[in-house]
Amino acid sequence: MKRHATALLVSGALMFGAATAHAALPDEATLYKNPQCGCCDEYARHLEALGVDVTIIDDVELGDIKQQAGVPYGMGSCHTIEIGNYRIEGHVPMEAVEALFEQQPDVDGIGLAGMPIGTPGMPGPQSEPYNVYLFSDQDAQPFMTL
C-alpha cells in the first residue's frame, strides 16, 4: 500500500513538473516579420506550443525595428520578437529562449544570425552548431552553443 501511494505521489510530481516546465516564459509576444516570410509564422507556432500568445505584425521596415531593439549589425534575421523585457532575433532554438528567461541576464536580447536549417521554423536536420548570442546596445557576446 505504501509503495502504491509513493508511486502515485512521484508520478503526480513528475506530471506537475512537466506542466510547469515553461512557466518562466511570458504569456505574450509580438513577432515582426516580412509579409512574405512563412518560416516566421512557423517559429510563432513553436512559441505558441510553449503557451505564449503570439501577435504577428507584417512589416517591411524591419531595419528600423531591429535598430530600436539593439540588434547588432550582422546578427539580423528574418524576424524580431518582443517578449517580456527582451528581444529575440531570428530562429533561436526554444532551449535558448527558455534559458534566457531562467537566467534573466541584463541584456536587450538574444539572437541567432541568418536562417539556419533545423532551427524552429526552418525545415531539415541540424547541420551545424547554433551559436546564440546575447546582445545589448548593438554589441554581441556568446550566450550558448546548441
What are these regions (language model features)?
Residues 1-5:
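Positively charged n-region of N-terminal signal peptides that target proteins for export
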Residues 7-17:
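Bacterial N-terminal signal peptides
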Residues 23-50:
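Local sequence-structure signature of Cys/Sec-based thiol-disulfide redox active-site neighborhoods
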Residues 28-29, 52-54, 84-87:
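Short active-site oxyanion
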Residues 36, 43, 58-61, 93-97:
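Stable alpha-helical elements in mature extracytoplasmic
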Residues 44-64:
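Conserved helix-turn-beta segment immediately C-terminal to the redox Cys motif
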Residues 68-146:
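Thiol/selenol-based redox catalytic cores and closely related redox-interacting motifs
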